């Protein structure tokens, strides 16, 4: 378990809508999709869901921490908002994802 004291939420999951912005979000893991070299985590809070993304550019320790996450884990994640290559029109934040560079479980 990581200390989360030095991370402060900058926006809620359902409010992630500005590409290029650095954000800190927190919430519960809704779903984890591990595709080997890519991991996607749907993080939810009271406002909605945002997708967290981990790829080959992600720090190895953070990538491995993401791979160990399961449903209902509580996370804080810091990263840069990016436009998603495949938009999910059923989600309010479906056009964006957070490219994570700091993850606390």
Where are these regions (language model features)?
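OB-fold and OB-like single-stranded nucleic-acid-recognition modules
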Residues: 1-105
